[in-house]
Protein backbone atom coordinates (compact mmCIF):
# COMPACT_ATOMS: atom_id res chain seq x y z
CA UNK A 1 0.00 0.00 0.00
CA UNK A 2 1.45 3.27 -1.06
CA UNK A 3 1.99 6.21 1.31
CA UNK A 4 -0.58 8.33 -0.53
CA UNK A 5 -3.31 5.79 0.08
CA UNK A 6 -2.33 5.57 3.72
CA UNK A 7 -2.56 9.36 4.07
CA UNK A 8 -5.99 9.43 2.45
CA UNK A 9 -7.23 6.69 4.77
CA UNK A 10 -5.91 8.57 7.82
CA UNK A 11 -7.52 11.84 6.67
CA UNK A 12 -10.81 10.07 6.06
CA UNK A 13 -10.70 8.49 9.52
CA UNK A 14 -9.97 11.88 11.11
CA UNK A 15 -12.93 13.42 9.26
CA UNK A 16 -15.21 10.61 10.34
CA UNK A 17 -14.07 10.91 13.95
CA UNK A 18 -14.52 14.71 13.88
CA UNK A 19 -18.00 14.44 12.37
CA UNK A 20 -18.99 11.86 14.94
CA UNK A 21 -17.70 14.04 17.78
CA UNK A 22 -19.60 17.05 16.35
CA UNK A 23 -22.79 14.98 16.01
CA UNK A 24 -22.50 13.73 19.60
CA UNK A 25 -21.88 17.31 20.88
CA UNK A 26 -24.81 18.80 18.95
CA UNK A 27 -27.11 16.00 20.07
CA UNK A 28 -26.03 16.52 23.70
CA UNK A 29 -26.68 20.29 23.60
CA UNK A 30 -30.11 19.84 22.05
CA UNK A 31 -30.90 17.08 24.52
CA UNK A 32 -29.97 19.40 27.44
CA UNK A 33 -32.33 22.08 26.10
CA UNK A 34 -35.10 19.48 25.73
CA UNK A 35 -34.56 18.36 29.33
CA UNK A 36 -34.73 22.01 30.48
CA UNK A 37 -37.99 22.38 28.58
CA UNK A 38 -39.36 19.28 30.29
CA UNK A 39 -38.45 20.71 33.69
CA UNK A 40 -40.07 24.11 32.93
CA UNK A 41 -43.17 22.31 31.64
CA UNK A 42 -43.43 20.19 34.80
CA UNK A 43 -42.89 23.24 37.02
CA UNK A 44 -45.57 25.14 35.16
CA UNK A 45 -47.97 22.21 35.29
CA UNK A 46 -47.33 21.73 39.02
CA UNK A 47 -48.39 25.31 39.88
CA UNK A 48 -51.60 25.32 42.02
CA UNK A 49 -53.53 27.31 39.46
CA UNK A 50 -56.48 24.94 39.44
CA UNK A 51 -56.68 24.97 43.24
CA UNK A 52 -56.64 28.79 43.29
CA UNK A 53 -59.40 28.89 40.69
CA UNK A 54 -61.46 26.34 42.59
CA UNK A 55 -61.17 28.40 45.77
CA UNK A 56 -62.50 31.47 43.95
CA UNK A 57 -65.34 29.40 42.49
CA UNK A 58 -66.48 28.71 46.03
CA UNK A 59 -66.91 32.48 46.52
CA UNK A 60 -69.90 32.36 44.14
CA UNK A 61 -68.98 35.56 42.39
CA UNK A 62 -71.60 37.52 40.43
CA UNK A 63 -71.78 40.63 38.31
CA UNK A 64 -68.55 42.31 37.25
CA UNK A 65 -66.41 40.08 39.47
CA UNK A 66 -67.94 36.96 37.93
CA UNK A 67 -67.30 38.28 34.41
CA UNK A 68 -63.63 38.89 35.21
CA UNK A 69 -63.30 35.46 36.85
CA UNK A 70 -64.83 33.70 33.85
CA UNK A 71 -62.27 35.34 31.59
CA UNK A 72 -59.38 34.07 33.74
CA UNK A 73 -60.94 30.60 34.10
CA UNK A 74 -61.47 30.26 30.36
CA UNK A 75 -57.90 31.29 29.74
CA UNK A 76 -56.70 28.58 32.15
CA UNK A 77 -58.88 25.96 30.48
CA UNK A 78 -57.39 26.84 27.09
CA UNK A 79 -53.88 26.57 28.51
CA UNK A 80 -54.40 23.33 30.39
CA UNK A 81 -56.31 21.51 27.65
CA UNK A 82 -54.72 22.86 24.47
CA UNK A 83 -51.45 24.65 25.11
CA UNK A 84 -49.92 21.96 27.32
CA UNK A 85 -50.77 19.21 24.78
CA UNK A 86 -49.37 21.27 21.96
CA UNK A 87 -46.19 21.87 23.96
CA UNK A 88 -45.84 18.10 24.64
CA UNK A 89 -46.13 17.41 20.93
CA UNK A 90 -43.44 19.97 20.06
CA UNK A 91 -41.04 18.58 22.70
CA UNK A 92 -41.61 15.00 21.48
CA UNK A 93 -40.97 16.07 17.89
CA UNK A 94 -37.71 17.73 18.96
CA UNK A 95 -36.60 14.53 20.74
CA UNK A 96 -37.30 12.43 17.62
CA UNK A 97 -35.40 14.81 15.38
CA UNK A 98 -32.47 14.92 17.79
CA UNK A 99 -32.29 11.13 18.08
CA UNK A 100 -32.23 10.83 14.28
CA UNK A 101 -29.40 13.37 14.06
CA UNK A 102 -31.54 16.04 12.36
CA UNK A 103 -29.73 18.59 14.44
CA UNK A 104 -30.78 21.79 12.74
CA UNK A 105 -34.48 20.88 12.55
CA UNK A 106 -34.27 19.71 16.15
CA UNK A 107 -32.82 23.06 17.22
CA UNK A 108 -35.61 24.92 15.42
CA UNK A 109 -38.23 22.77 17.10
CA UNK A 110 -36.63 23.37 20.53
CA UNK A 111 -36.55 27.14 19.89
CA UNK A 112 -40.27 27.11 18.98
CA UNK A 113 -41.04 25.17 22.15
CA UNK A 114 -39.03 27.62 24.29
CA UNK A 115 -40.92 30.57 22.82
CA UNK A 116 -44.22 28.77 23.40
CA UNK A 117 -43.47 27.96 27.03
CA UNK A 118 -42.42 31.57 27.70
CA UNK A 119 -45.83 32.71 26.49
CA UNK A 120 -47.53 30.08 28.59
CA UNK A 121 -45.57 31.11 31.69
CA UNK A 122 -46.64 34.73 31.15
CA UNK A 123 -50.27 33.71 30.68
CA UNK A 124 -50.23 31.55 33.81
CA UNK A 125 -48.69 34.39 35.83
CA UNK A 126 -51.39 36.77 34.55
CA UNK A 127 -54.14 34.28 35.46
CA UNK A 128 -52.77 33.81 38.97
CA UNK A 129 -52.44 37.57 39.52
CA UNK A 130 -55.99 38.21 38.27
CA UNK A 131 -57.42 35.52 40.53
CA UNK A 132 -55.32 36.84 43.45
CA UNK A 133 -56.71 40.35 42.88
CA UNK A 134 -60.26 39.02 43.18
CA UNK A 135 -59.35 37.35 46.46
CA UNK A 136 -57.50 40.45 47.69
CA UNK A 137 -60.46 42.68 46.78
CA UNK A 138 -62.69 40.49 48.88
CA UNK A 139 -60.27 40.78 51.81
CA UNK A 140 -60.06 44.57 51.41
CA UNK A 141 -63.82 44.86 51.33
CA UNK A 142 -64.04 42.83 54.51
CA UNK A 143 -61.44 45.02 56.26
CA UNK A 144 -62.75 48.33 54.95
CA UNK A 145 -66.41 47.78 55.65
CA UNK A 146 -65.92 48.06 59.40
CA UNK A 147 -63.86 51.23 59.11
CA UNK A 148 -66.44 52.84 56.82
CA UNK A 149 -69.31 51.74 59.05
CA UNK A 150 -67.52 53.26 62.05
CA UNK A 151 -67.27 56.59 60.22
CA UNK A 152 -70.95 56.44 59.40
CA UNK A 153 -72.04 55.38 62.90
CA UNK A 154 -69.97 58.16 64.52
CA UNK A 155 -71.45 60.74 62.15
CA UNK A 156 -75.00 59.53 62.80
CA UNK A 157 -74.42 59.61 66.56
CA UNK A 158 -72.94 63.13 66.45
CA UNK A 159 -75.90 64.42 64.45
CA UNK A 160 -78.41 62.75 66.77
CA UNK A 161 -76.66 64.01 69.92
CA UNK A 162 -76.40 67.60 68.63
CA UNK A 163 -79.66 67.88 66.71
CA UNK A 164 -80.39 71.25 68.32
CA UNK A 165 -77.28 72.72 66.64
CA UNK A 166 -78.61 72.00 63.17
CA UNK A 167 -82.00 73.71 63.39
CA UNK A 168 -84.22 73.13 60.38
CA UNK A 169 -81.34 71.51 58.49
CA UNK A 170 -81.66 68.37 60.61
CA UNK A 171 -84.32 66.96 58.25
CA UNK A 172 -82.02 67.28 55.24
CA UNK A 173 -79.14 65.75 57.19
CA UNK A 174 -81.28 62.74 58.06
CA UNK A 175 -82.17 62.29 54.37
CA UNK A 176 -78.49 62.21 53.47
CA UNK A 177 -77.80 59.75 56.28
CA UNK A 178 -80.57 57.51 54.93
CA UNK A 179 -79.06 57.66 51.44
CA UNK A 180 -75.63 56.68 52.78
CA UNK A 181 -77.20 53.83 54.74
CA UNK A 182 -78.82 52.61 51.52
CA UNK A 183 -75.42 52.62 49.85
CA UNK A 184 -73.96 50.53 52.68
CA UNK A 185 -76.85 48.07 52.32
CA UNK A 186 -76.18 47.87 48.61
CA UNK A 187 -72.53 47.16 49.36
CA UNK A 188 -73.40 44.36 51.77
CA UNK A 189 -75.69 42.80 49.20
CA UNK A 190 -73.08 42.92 46.44
CA UNK A 191 -70.30 41.68 48.68
CA UNK A 192 -72.32 38.80 50.09
CA UNK A 193 -73.54 37.71 46.66
CA UNK A 194 -70.02 37.53 45.30
CA UNK A 195 -69.26 40.79 43.45
CA UNK A 196 -66.35 42.27 45.44
CA UNK A 197 -65.25 44.66 42.67
CA UNK A 198 -68.60 46.40 42.22
CA UNK A 199 -69.11 46.22 45.98
CA UNK A 200 -65.79 48.04 46.48
CA UNK A 201 -66.95 50.85 44.19
CA UNK A 202 -70.20 51.21 46.11
CA UNK A 203 -68.31 51.17 49.42
CA UNK A 204 -65.92 53.86 48.15
CA UNK A 205 -68.88 56.04 47.17
CA UNK A 206 -70.57 55.54 50.54
CA UNK A 207 -67.38 56.48 52.38
CA UNK A 208 -66.88 59.60 50.23
CA UNK A 209 -70.46 60.68 50.94
CA UNK A 210 -69.90 60.08 54.66
CA UNK A 211 -66.74 62.21 54.72
CA UNK A 212 -68.42 64.96 52.68
CA UNK A 213 -71.43 65.00 55.01
CA UNK A 214 -69.09 65.16 58.01
CA UNK A 215 -67.41 68.25 56.51
CA UNK A 216 -70.80 69.84 55.94
CA UNK A 217 -72.01 69.16 59.49
CA UNK A 218 -68.88 70.81 60.88
CA UNK A 219 -69.75 74.07 59.06
CA UNK A 220 -73.52 74.07 59.58
CA UNK A 221 -73.60 75.10 63.30
CA UNK A 222 -71.64 78.25 62.54
CA UNK A 223 -73.97 79.12 59.67
CA UNK A 224 -77.04 78.27 61.80
CA UNK A 225 -75.80 80.62 64.53
CA UNK A 226 -75.18 83.38 62.01
CA UNK A 227 -78.53 82.93 60.23
CA UNK A 228 -80.75 82.31 63.26
CA UNK A 229 -79.07 84.52 65.87
CA UNK A 230 -76.35 86.91 64.70
CA UNK A 231 -77.99 88.34 61.58
CA UNK A 232 -81.48 88.70 63.13
CA UNK A 233 -79.88 90.49 66.07
CA UNK A 234 -78.03 92.85 63.73
CA UNK A 235 -81.20 93.49 61.76
CA UNK A 236 -83.07 94.21 64.99
CA UNK A 237 -80.34 96.66 66.04
CA UNK A 238 -80.44 98.20 62.58
CA UNK A 239 -84.22 98.62 62.82
CA UNK A 240 -83.82 100.29 66.22
CA UNK A 241 -81.21 102.63 64.76
CA UNK A 242 -83.56 103.38 61.87
CA UNK A 243 -86.46 104.11 64.24
CA UNK A 244 -84.24 106.41 66.29
CA UNK A 245 -83.09 108.07 63.09
CA UNK A 246 -86.69 108.82 62.12
CA UNK A 247 -87.64 109.88 65.67
CA UNK A 248 -84.86 112.46 65.65
CA UNK A 249 -86.36 113.90 62.46
CA UNK A 250 -83.53 113.00 60.13
CA UNK A 251 -84.26 113.10 56.42
CA UNK A 252 -82.65 110.55 54.12
CA UNK A 253 -81.58 111.19 50.53
CA UNK A 254 -84.20 110.34 47.90
CA UNK A 255 -82.27 107.28 46.75
CA UNK A 256 -82.36 105.67 50.22
CA UNK A 257 -85.55 103.80 51.23
CA UNK A 258 -85.06 102.19 54.63
CA UNK A 259 -88.12 99.94 54.41
CA UNK A 260 -87.13 98.56 51.02
CA UNK A 261 -83.60 97.95 52.21
CA UNK A 262 -84.75 96.20 55.39
CA UNK A 263 -87.13 94.01 53.36
CA UNK A 264 -84.27 93.20 51.00
CA UNK A 265 -82.08 92.16 53.95
CA UNK A 266 -84.82 89.86 55.28
CA UNK A 267 -85.20 88.32 51.82
CA UNK A 268 -81.48 87.59 51.69
CA UNK A 269 -81.68 86.03 55.16
CA UNK A 270 -84.51 83.72 54.04
CA UNK A 271 -82.52 82.83 50.92
CA UNK A 272 -79.49 81.99 53.08
CA UNK A 273 -81.59 79.62 55.20
CA UNK A 274 -83.01 77.95 52.09
CA UNK A 275 -79.56 77.51 50.56
CA UNK A 276 -78.25 76.05 53.81
CA UNK A 277 -80.98 73.39 53.75
CA UNK A 278 -79.77 72.52 50.25
CA UNK A 279 -76.17 72.34 51.52
CA UNK A 280 -75.14 75.14 49.10
CA UNK A 281 -72.54 76.31 51.59
CA UNK A 282 -70.55 78.50 49.19
CA UNK A 283 -73.70 80.36 48.19
CA UNK A 284 -74.74 80.64 51.84
CA UNK A 285 -71.40 82.27 52.62
CA UNK A 286 -71.84 84.65 49.68
CA UNK A 287 -75.35 85.61 50.81
CA UNK A 288 -74.20 86.27 54.37
CA UNK A 289 -71.34 88.38 53.05
CA UNK A 290 -73.81 90.38 50.97
CA UNK A 291 -76.03 90.91 54.02
CA UNK A 292 -73.01 92.16 55.97
CA UNK A 293 -72.13 94.63 53.20
CA UNK A 294 -75.70 95.94 52.99
CA UNK A 295 -75.95 96.35 56.78
CA UNK A 296 -72.65 98.23 56.90
CA UNK A 297 -73.81 100.39 53.99
CA UNK A 298 -76.94 101.43 55.94
CA UNK A 299 -74.92 102.16 59.06
CA UNK A 300 -72.57 104.25 56.91
CA UNK A 301 -75.58 106.24 55.65
CA UNK A 302 -76.74 106.84 59.23
CA UNK A 303 -73.25 107.83 60.34
CA UNK A 304 -72.88 110.17 57.37
CA UNK A 305 -76.11 111.94 58.29
CA UNK A 306 -75.15 112.13 61.99
CA UNK A 307 -71.74 113.55 61.09
CA UNK A 308 -73.32 115.96 58.61
CA UNK A 309 -75.74 117.18 61.29
CA UNK A 310 -72.90 117.91 63.69
CA UNK A 311 -71.11 119.86 60.97
CA UNK A 312 -74.27 121.79 60.04
CA UNK A 313 -75.08 122.67 63.65
CA UNK A 314 -71.50 123.78 64.27
CA UNK A 315 -71.05 125.91 61.16
CA UNK A 316 -74.52 127.18 60.34
CA UNK A 317 -74.74 129.09 63.62
CA UNK A 318 -71.85 131.37 62.60
CA UNK A 319 -72.62 131.81 58.90
CA UNK A 320 -74.41 135.13 59.35
CA UNK A 321 -71.68 136.44 61.64
CA UNK A 322 -69.02 135.31 59.20
CA UNK A 323 -70.75 137.09 56.32
CA UNK A 324 -71.05 140.28 58.37
CA UNK A 325 -67.37 139.99 59.28
CA UNK A 326 -66.36 139.63 55.62
CA UNK A 327 -68.75 142.45 54.67
CA UNK A 328 -67.15 144.74 57.27
CA UNK A 329 -63.71 143.79 55.97
CA UNK A 330 -64.88 144.66 52.47
CA UNK A 331 -66.15 148.06 53.60
CA UNK A 332 -62.90 148.85 55.40
CA UNK A 333 -60.93 147.66 52.39
CA UNK A 334 -62.82 150.02 50.06
CA UNK A 335 -62.08 152.90 52.43
CA UNK A 336 -58.43 151.90 52.53
CA UNK A 337 -58.30 151.74 48.73
CA UNK A 338 -59.83 155.24 48.48
CA UNK A 339 -57.25 156.51 50.93
CA UNK A 340 -54.32 154.82 49.22
CA UNK A 341 -55.31 156.01 45.75
CA UNK A 342 -54.75 159.58 46.91
CA UNK A 343 -51.02 158.86 47.00
CA UNK A 344 -50.64 155.83 44.72
CA UNK A 345 -51.83 154.67 41.33
CA UNK A 346 -53.21 151.09 41.65
CA UNK A 347 -52.81 148.91 38.58
CA UNK A 348 -54.24 145.63 39.92
CA UNK A 349 -57.97 146.49 39.70
CA UNK A 350 -58.16 146.05 43.46
CA UNK A 351 -61.30 148.16 43.75
CA UNK A 352 -63.06 146.08 41.08
CA UNK A 353 -62.21 142.88 42.91
CA UNK A 354 -63.51 144.23 46.22
CA UNK A 355 -66.79 145.31 44.61
CA UNK A 356 -67.04 141.83 43.11
CA UNK A 357 -66.62 140.36 46.57
CA UNK A 358 -69.50 142.54 47.75
CA UNK A 359 -71.79 141.13 45.06
CA UNK A 360 -70.67 137.59 45.90
CA UNK A 361 -71.43 138.26 49.58
CA UNK A 362 -74.98 139.28 48.72
CA UNK A 363 -75.45 136.01 46.81
CA UNK A 364 -73.97 133.98 49.67
CA UNK A 365 -76.18 135.81 52.16
CA UNK A 366 -79.21 134.72 50.15
CA UNK A 367 -77.93 131.13 50.08
CA UNK A 368 -77.46 131.18 53.85
CA UNK A 369 -81.04 132.37 54.38
CA UNK A 370 -82.26 129.44 52.28
CA UNK A 371 -80.00 126.98 54.12
CA UNK A 372 -81.14 128.19 57.54
CA UNK A 373 -84.76 127.92 56.40
CA UNK A 374 -84.22 124.31 55.31
CA UNK A 375 -82.54 123.50 58.62
CA UNK A 376 -85.46 124.99 60.52
CA UNK A 377 -88.04 123.20 58.36
CA UNK A 378 -86.13 119.87 58.48
CA UNK A 379 -87.06 119.07 54.90
CA UNK A 380 -83.62 118.23 53.54
CA UNK A 381 -80.99 115.58 54.41
CA UNK A 382 -78.18 116.90 56.57
CA UNK A 383 -75.63 115.46 54.13
CA UNK A 384 -76.92 117.84 51.43
CA UNK A 385 -77.16 120.74 53.88
CA UNK A 386 -73.62 120.01 55.05
CA UNK A 387 -72.27 120.22 51.51
CA UNK A 388 -74.06 123.54 50.98
CA UNK A 389 -72.80 124.92 54.31
CA UNK A 390 -69.25 123.81 53.47
CA UNK A 391 -69.54 125.44 50.05
CA UNK A 392 -70.56 128.78 51.64
CA UNK A 393 -67.80 128.59 54.25
CA UNK A 394 -65.19 127.76 51.60
CA UNK A 395 -66.36 130.70 49.47
CA UNK A 396 -66.17 133.06 52.47
CA UNK A 397 -62.70 131.79 53.33
CA UNK A 398 -61.55 132.40 49.75
CA UNK A 399 -62.94 135.96 49.84
CA UNK A 400 -61.24 136.61 53.17
CA UNK A 401 -57.91 135.30 51.87
CA UNK A 402 -58.15 137.60 48.84
CA UNK A 403 -59.10 140.54 51.08
CA UNK A 404 -56.03 139.93 53.21
CA UNK A 405 -53.89 139.67 50.08
CA UNK A 406 -55.17 143.03 48.77
CA UNK A 407 -54.78 144.62 52.21
CA UNK A 408 -51.19 143.37 52.43
CA UNK A 409 -50.53 144.81 48.98
CA UNK A 410 -51.89 148.23 50.01
CA UNK A 411 -49.95 148.18 53.27
CA UNK A 412 -46.77 147.27 51.41
CA UNK A 413 -46.96 150.22 49.03
CA UNK A 414 -45.44 152.61 51.56
CA UNK A 415 -42.67 150.11 52.35
CA UNK A 416 -41.91 149.70 48.64
CA UNK A 417 -41.85 153.47 48.20
CA UNK A 418 -39.49 153.88 51.15
CA UNK A 419 -37.18 151.14 49.84
CA UNK A 420 -37.13 152.72 46.36
CA UNK A 421 -36.30 156.14 47.88
CA UNK A 422 -33.38 154.64 49.79
CA UNK A 423 -32.09 152.92 46.65
CA UNK A 424 -32.33 156.13 44.61
CA UNK A 425 -30.40 158.08 47.24
CA UNK A 426 -27.75 155.35 47.47
CA UNK A 427 -27.32 155.26 43.68
CA UNK A 428 -27.05 159.08 43.58
CA UNK A 429 -24.33 158.97 46.23
CA UNK A 430 -22.47 156.17 44.42
CA UNK A 431 -22.55 158.13 41.15
CA UNK A 432 -20.86 161.09 42.85
CA UNK A 433 -18.31 158.73 44.41
CA UNK A 434 -17.54 157.17 41.01
CA UNK A 435 -17.09 160.62 39.51
CA UNK A 436 -14.61 161.65 42.23
CA UNK A 437 -12.75 158.34 41.95
CA UNK A 438 -12.26 158.72 38.19
CA UNK A 439 -11.20 162.38 38.55
CA UNK A 440 -8.48 161.36 41.03
CA UNK A 441 -6.92 159.19 38.34
CA UNK A 442 -5.96 162.39 36.43
CA UNK A 443 -6.68 160.81 33.08
CA UNK A 444 -6.30 162.89 29.89
CA UNK A 445 -9.96 162.22 29.13
CA UNK A 446 -12.67 159.53 29.15
CA UNK A 447 -13.92 157.30 26.32
CA UNK A 448 -17.26 158.27 24.78
CA UNK A 449 -18.93 154.91 25.51
CA UNK A 450 -18.03 155.21 29.20
CA UNK A 451 -19.36 158.78 29.36
CA UNK A 452 -22.60 157.66 27.66
CA UNK A 453 -22.97 154.85 30.20
CA UNK A 454 -22.31 157.19 33.12
CA UNK A 455 -24.81 159.84 32.00
CA UNK A 456 -27.45 157.26 31.04
CA UNK A 457 -27.22 155.73 34.51
CA UNK A 458 -27.47 159.18 36.05
CA UNK A 459 -30.58 159.88 33.99
CA UNK A 460 -32.14 156.60 35.20
CA UNK A 461 -31.58 157.58 38.81
CA UNK A 462 -32.99 161.07 38.20
CA UNK A 463 -36.07 159.56 36.55
CA UNK A 464 -36.50 157.42 39.66
CA UNK A 465 -36.37 160.56 41.83
CA UNK A 466 -38.86 162.21 39.50
CA UNK A 467 -41.36 159.35 39.77
CA UNK A 468 -40.93 159.24 43.54
CA UNK A 469 -41.68 162.96 43.69
CA UNK A 470 -45.06 162.72 41.94
CA UNK A 471 -48.28 163.42 43.87
CA UNK A 472 -49.62 159.93 43.00
CA UNK A 473 -46.98 157.29 42.70
CA UNK A 474 -47.20 154.33 40.31
CA UNK A 475 -45.36 151.72 42.33
CA UNK A 476 -45.08 149.38 39.32
CA UNK A 477 -43.25 152.08 37.34
CA UNK A 478 -41.00 152.79 40.32
CA UNK A 479 -40.15 149.11 40.79
CA UNK A 480 -39.31 148.86 37.10
CA UNK A 481 -36.98 151.89 37.35
CA UNK A 482 -35.36 150.39 40.46
CA UNK A 483 -34.64 147.16 38.56
CA UNK A 484 -33.25 149.00 35.50
CA UNK A 485 -31.16 151.41 37.63
CA UNK A 486 -29.76 148.52 39.64
CA UNK A 487 -28.59 146.78 36.47
CA UNK A 488 -27.13 150.04 35.06
CA UNK A 489 -25.21 150.73 38.29
CA UNK A 490 -23.78 147.21 38.22
CA UNK A 491 -22.57 147.66 34.62
CA UNK A 492 -21.19 151.16 35.39
CA UNK A 493 -19.20 149.91 38.38
CA UNK A 494 -17.64 147.11 36.33
CA UNK A 495 -16.82 149.55 33.50
CA UNK A 496 -15.28 152.04 35.97
CA UNK A 497 -13.13 149.36 37.56
CA UNK A 498 -11.88 148.07 34.18
CA UNK A 499 -11.22 151.61 32.91
CA UNK A 500 -9.20 152.81 35.91
CA UNK A 501 -7.31 149.50 36.32
CA UNK A 502 -6.17 149.43 32.69
CA UNK A 503 -5.28 153.14 32.73
CA UNK A 504 -3.06 152.81 35.83
CA UNK A 505 -1.46 149.56 34.59
CA UNK A 506 -0.82 151.04 31.13
CA UNK A 507 1.12 153.94 32.73
CA UNK A 508 3.13 151.56 34.97
CA UNK A 509 3.99 149.22 32.08
CA UNK A 510 5.03 152.13 29.82
CA UNK A 511 7.36 153.43 32.55
CA UNK A 512 8.80 149.91 33.02
CA UNK A 513 9.30 149.44 29.26
CA UNK A 514 11.29 152.69 28.92
CA UNK A 515 14.39 150.81 30.16
CA UNK A 516 14.38 148.83 26.89
CA UNK A 517 13.48 151.77 24.64
CA UNK A 518 16.98 152.88 23.68
CA UNK A 519 18.29 149.40 22.93
CA UNK A 520 15.24 147.94 21.15
CA UNK A 521 13.49 149.67 18.28
CA UNK A 522 10.42 147.39 18.56
CA UNK A 523 9.97 148.43 22.20
CA UNK A 524 10.32 152.09 21.24
CA UNK A 525 7.64 151.71 18.57
CA UNK A 526 5.36 149.79 21.00
CA UNK A 527 5.72 152.52 23.63
CA UNK A 528 4.88 155.12 21.00
CA UNK A 529 1.71 153.29 19.94
CA UNK A 530 0.66 152.75 23.59
CA UNK A 531 1.12 156.47 24.36
CA UNK A 532 -0.85 157.41 21.25
CA UNK A 533 -3.77 155.19 22.38
CA UNK A 534 -3.52 156.48 25.97
CA UNK A 535 -3.17 160.25 25.42
CA UNK A 536 -4.91 160.92 22.13
CA UNK A 537 -7.48 158.13 21.65
CA UNK A 538 -8.18 157.70 25.37
CA UNK A 539 -8.33 153.97 24.68
CA UNK A 540 -6.90 152.73 27.96
CA UNK A 541 -7.81 149.10 27.28
CA UNK A 542 -6.03 149.23 23.91
CA UNK A 543 -3.00 151.00 25.44
CA UNK A 544 -2.73 148.31 28.13
CA UNK A 545 -2.94 145.48 25.56
CA UNK A 546 -0.34 147.14 23.27
CA UNK A 547 2.30 147.73 25.97
CA UNK A 548 1.68 144.22 27.43
CA UNK A 549 2.47 142.61 24.03
CA UNK A 550 5.54 144.84 23.62
CA UNK A 551 6.97 143.83 27.02
CA UNK A 552 6.45 140.14 26.19
CA UNK A 553 8.97 140.54 23.34
CA UNK A 554 11.84 141.52 25.62
CA UNK A 555 10.79 140.23 29.05
CA UNK A 556 8.17 137.49 28.96
CA UNK A 557 5.89 137.48 32.05
CA UNK A 558 6.76 141.03 33.09
CA UNK A 559 3.26 142.39 32.34
CA UNK A 560 1.58 139.60 34.33
CA UNK A 561 3.95 140.09 37.25
CA UNK A 562 3.41 143.87 37.43
CA UNK A 563 -0.38 143.38 37.09
CA UNK A 564 -0.36 140.84 39.92
CA UNK A 565 1.46 143.23 42.25
CA UNK A 566 -1.00 146.00 41.34
CA UNK A 567 -4.12 144.00 42.06
CA UNK A 568 -2.65 142.60 45.27
CA UNK A 569 -1.96 146.07 46.71
CA UNK A 570 -4.91 147.89 45.16
CA UNK A 571 -7.38 149.31 47.75
CA UNK A 572 -11.12 148.64 47.31
CA UNK A 573 -12.80 151.63 45.60
CA UNK A 574 -15.32 153.60 47.70
CA UNK A 575 -18.15 152.94 45.25
CA UNK A 576 -17.98 149.15 45.73
From Swiss-Prot:
Keywords: Cell cycle, Cell division, Cell membrane, Coiled coil, Membrane, Septation, Transmembrane, Transmembrane helix. One of its GO terms (cellular component) is septin ring. Residues 27-576 are cytoplasmic. It is a single-pass membrane protein. It is found in: Cell membrane. The chain crosses the membrane at residues 8-26. Residues 105-134, 277-301 form a coiled coil. The keyword Cytoplasm does not apply. Residues 1-7 are extracellular. GO terms for biological process: division septum assembly; septin ring assembly. HAMAP family: EzrA. Negative regulator of FtsZ ring formation; modulates the frequency and position of FtsZ ring formation. Inhibits FtsZ ring formation at polar sites. Interacts either with FtsZ or with one of its binding partners to promote depolymerization. Belongs to the EzrA family. This is Septation ring formation regulator EzrA.
Amino acid sequence: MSSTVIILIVVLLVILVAFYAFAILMRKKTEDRILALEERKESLFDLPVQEEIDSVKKMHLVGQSQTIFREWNQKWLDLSSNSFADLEEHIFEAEQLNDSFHFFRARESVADSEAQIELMEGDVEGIRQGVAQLVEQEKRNSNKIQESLDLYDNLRSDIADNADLYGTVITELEKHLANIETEFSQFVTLNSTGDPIEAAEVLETAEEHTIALRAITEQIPSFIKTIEKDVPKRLEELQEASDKFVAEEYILPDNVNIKERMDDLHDHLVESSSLLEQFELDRVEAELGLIQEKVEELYAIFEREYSARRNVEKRSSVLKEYIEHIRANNKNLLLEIDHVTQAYILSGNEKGYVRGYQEHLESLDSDVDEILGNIQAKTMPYSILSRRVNSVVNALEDIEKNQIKISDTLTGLRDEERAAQEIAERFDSELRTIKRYVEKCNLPGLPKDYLDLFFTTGDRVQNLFKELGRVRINIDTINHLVDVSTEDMHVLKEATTNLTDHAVLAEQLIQYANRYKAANEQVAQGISRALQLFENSRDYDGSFDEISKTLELVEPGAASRISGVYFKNKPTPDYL
